[in-house]
């Protein structure tokens, strides 16, 4: 009798437990369906910390925030010649599983590391400057630097005359985009090229401090120089410092730059810089990362995207800030 009293309650408990399990399964919230595709991880690498590349980054960050299907990892080198820094960033991003890298290459030296990334299925979009000899990139999103240089040269041809002296502050010799800015400028001079004298050509690594020292050497050796062309924006700021130190007045030396950075535009307004070729870094950044994303998603993208140039002078400087 006592045995039956024990068994009945146990059977009842087991029965209730079974009902509870079934009921909880029926009332439980259905599992959310899995996303058909995971978020695409992309890398975005820029050369070094100056306004131009910060603008590229900020544009890519805005795109990233507005694109839920993507996650962008950012890295930046220390200088215009920091090949090692970019190579390390490429390696790090590949290790973190990016499916694509958008990069402003410091030089052709980084292409070997990009080849390794491509072998692992990573797409590569070059921004700001091309590596013409390297054919494995998916796309190039950049200023046409040769055309920009021609624009500068044509402008200089309206300011110079036969017999005038021209100095050139190069960027990083051997970097195709920067060389194109110089070659384009010389081409843009047209027939005047053979009538003027290029008295000095010095490299600056696109750095303000190196631009300052190069400008000191150039102006000391050529005190009667008529014009100076700079293939990058930061060296112009160093040049302006030298002009002021040497007691020059705005306009004494024709100064034409490339980049039209905010600080350059301020010098254009003040009369120290005569003109600069403007790029559109925000456009490069946003189109660069968007083009990369489309290619990773299997969409067809153009091999080249020209983001345009414009000549900035005192007449239109207000349109470019500074």
How would you describe each model-predicted region?
Residues 3-9, 27-322:
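A residue-level marker of the well-folded mature domains of exported/periplasmic proteins
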């Amino acid at each position: 009798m006592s045995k039956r009293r024990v068994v009945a309650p146990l059977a009842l408990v087991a029965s209730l437990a079974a009902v509870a399990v079934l009921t909880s399964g029926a009332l439980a919230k259905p599992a959310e369906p899995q996303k058909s595709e995971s978020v695409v991880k992309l890398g975005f690498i820029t050369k070094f910390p100056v306004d131009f590349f910060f603008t590229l980054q900020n544009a890519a960050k805005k795109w990233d925030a507005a694109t839920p299907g993507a996650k962008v990892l950012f890295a930046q080198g220390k200088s215009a010649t920091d090949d090692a820094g970019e190579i390390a960033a490429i390696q790090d991003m590949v290790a973190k599983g990016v499916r694509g890298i958008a990069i402003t290459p410091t030089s052709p030296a980084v292409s070997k590391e990009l080849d390794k990334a491509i072998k692992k299925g990573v797409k590569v979009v070059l921004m700001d400057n091309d590596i013409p000899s390297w054919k494995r990139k998916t796309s190039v999103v950049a200023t046409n630097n040769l055309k920009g240089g021609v624009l500068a040269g044509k402008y200089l041809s309206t300011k110079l005359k036969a017999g005038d002296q021209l100095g050139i502050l190069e960027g990083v010799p051997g970097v195709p985009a920067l060389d194109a800015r110089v070659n384009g400028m010389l081409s843009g001079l047209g027939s005047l090229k053979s009538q003027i004298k290029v008295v000095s050509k010095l490299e600056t690594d696109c750095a303000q401090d190196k631009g300052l020292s190069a400008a000191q050497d150039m102006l000391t050796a050529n005190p009667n120089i008529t014009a100076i062309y700079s293939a990058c924006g930061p060296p112009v700021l160093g040049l302006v410092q030298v002009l002021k130190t040497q007691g020059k007045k705005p306009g004494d030396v024709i100064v034409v730059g490339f980049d039209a950075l905010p600080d350059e535009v301020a010098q254009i307004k003040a009369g120290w810089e005569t003109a600069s070729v403007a790029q559109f870094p925000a456009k490069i950044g946003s189109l660069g990362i968007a083009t990369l994303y489309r290619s990773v998603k299997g969409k067809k993208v153009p091999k080249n995207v020209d983001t345009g140039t414009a000549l900035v002078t005192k007449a239109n400087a207000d349109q470019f800030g500074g």
